[in-house]
Curated annotation (Swiss-Prot):
It is an enzyme of class 6 (ligase). Belongs to the class-I aminoacyl-tRNA synthetase family. This is Cysteine--tRNA ligase. It comes from Rhizobium etli (strain CIAT 652). The lineage of its organism: Bacteria, Pseudomonadati, Pseudomonadota, Alphaproteobacteria, Hyphomicrobiales. Its EC number is 6.1.1.16. Transmembrane segments: none annotated. Zn(2+) binds at residues 33, 221, 246, 250. One of its GO terms (molecular function) is ATP binding.
């Protein structure tokens, strides 16, 4: 690691913080559960995106940019997507309606995370592009005696796995209804879960040995992580709410299909996000999307920069719960305002910040050390370069080239959404996006593709 402090991570699987030892230092592999693209991402979704972006940056710094593979999936087949498609596009055939929902939502997600200063993952597979891999794993589970067919569904037999429940530490006999576990009469055991279910004529489906159907939620991540990272990989991340049943069931499927002792060596989970001391929910009226926070005045009567949201998240340790509030955002904004605008050059990150990050991503201590460094950076160019290199590692001060890339990605995403709005004849929303970009100095030019005749939009920064 060449002078870099020893990296220690808390492992949910062992309930211990231990030294991280990658399977292959030349190819460190990390998988993080990404969005289900039926609705815009909310600030709770922003937390794992930011947390694991910091870890991605740290791993790249320690092992080298070309020696880390970060995969974050897109779930684009789900009953919630079907319901949203029927609600929002009742006049379209379901497949077209689903495509309209998923494309718009995925595009918005990419725009949101770009504004939060996040690097793109190396791989971002969609569930619908990996159906064959899911079917292959299900066939293995049936042949290995870990799955069965009942009432047209394929289910995982939880009692066939002696140590099922090792991640959540929940004994099998305690796993009754609740925690997103459905209990049905055709199950052998209450905790058995769906690997494949039949689709009606108007639902999305794929041909399989068990009839035309679609995958269960958990099998999707098992298939995508294996395809891009292998049977066993280094780190699997996500929110605390995913420990059970999602991650527990991923482990069960993957281990029983491939005959491995583990699926991932380290399991990391970030804590919950509350809003002003209350659980975030639409019924509470405190449901805040990333887009709303950045581009509307619904939270605190103003818009907030992406860097402020990012820093506000990093001011609490990732395993602790966050009470997301206007006060917290204001505190982060005041802190950012005191930091110098400098370029990293060839400087190395600050040792105190590196020590903090190497201690299970202690971003609280890292931000404190970075702020102390900022005071001297205003008057000392060398310290300023160190400050910039360190801030870049936290993603709160991107390199100029990455600022340009992030802005371009965000603009491209908004332009794509506007085109979809124009196609749907939703001119009010399209004009709103155009006005929003104009206010930021971005000029749009509408035209037609000479070959296809389709509407195209280009953009440029007004000089």
């Amino acid at each position: 690691m060449g002078g870099t402090p020893e990296l220690k991570l808390y492992n949910t699987l062992t309930r211990e913080k231990s030294v991280f030892a990658p399977i292959d230092p030349n190819n460190v592999r990390m998988y993080v559960c990404g969005p289900t693209v039926y609705d815009f991402a909310h600030i709770g979704n922003a937390r794992p995106v930011i947390v694991f972006d910091v870890l991605f940056r740290l791993l790249r710094h320690v092992y080298g940019e070309s020696h880390v593979t970060y995969a974050r999936n897109i779930t684009d087949v789900d009953d919630k997507i079907n319901a949203r498609a029927l609600r929002d596009h009742p006049g379209l055939p379901l497949n077209e309606a689903i495509r309209a929902v998923t494309e718009k939502t995925e595009t918005q997600f990419h725009a949101d995370v770009a504004e939060l200063g996040c690097l793109e993952p190396n791989v971002e597979p969609r569930a619908t592009d990996n159906i064959e891999e899911m079917i292959e794993i299900i066939e293995k589970l049936i042949s290995n005696g870990h799955a069965y067919v009942a009432s047209g569904e394929v289910l995982f037999d939880t009692k066939s796995m002696a140590d099922y429940g090792q991640l959540s530490k929940r004994p099998l006999d305690e796993q009754q209804a609740g925690a997103r576990v459905a209990v049905d009469a055709h199950k052998k055991n209450p905790g058995d879960f769906v690997l494949w279910k039949l689709s009606s004529h108007n639902e999305p489906g794929w041909d399989s040995p068990w009839g035309r159907g679609r995958p269960g939620w958990h099998i999707e991540c098992s298939a995508m992580s294996r395809r891009y990272l292998g049977d066993i990989f280094d780190i699997h991340g996500g929110g605390l709410d995913l420990i059970f049943p999602h991650h527990e069931n991923e482990i069960a499927q993957s281990r029983c299909a491939h005959g491995t002792e583990v699926m991932a060596n380290v399991w990391m989970h970030n804590g919950f996000v509350q809003v002003e001391g209350r659980k975030m929910s639409k019924s509470e009226g405190n449901f805040v999307t990333i887009h709303d926070l950045l581009h509307t005045e619904t939270f605190g009567g103003r818009k907030w920069p992406g860097a402020v949201l990012r820093l506000a998240m990093l001011m609490t340790h990732y395993r602790e719960p966050i009470d997301f509030s206007i006060k917290r955002l204001e505190e982060a904004e005041r802190l950012l305002a005191k930091w110098p605008a400098t370029e990293p050059g060839d400087a190395k990150p600050d040792e105190a910040v590196m020590n903090a990050l190497a201690d299970d991503l202690n971003t609280v201590a890292a931000v404190q050390a970075l702020h102390a460094l900022a005071q001297a950076a205003h008057t000392d160019a060398a310290v300023g370069a160190t400050f910039a290199a360190t801030a870049f590692l936290l993603g709160v001060l991107p390199k100029k080239a990455e600022i340009d890339e992030a802005v371009a990605a965000a603009v491209d995403a908004l332009v794509a959404i506007r085109l979809e709005m124009l196609k749907a004849k939703n001119f009010a929303e399209a004009d709103k996006i155009r006005d929003e970009l104009t206010a930021k100095g971005i000029q749009l030019k509408d035209g037609k593709d000479a070959a296809t005749g389709e509407r195209v939009t280009t953009w440029e920064v007004k000089r």
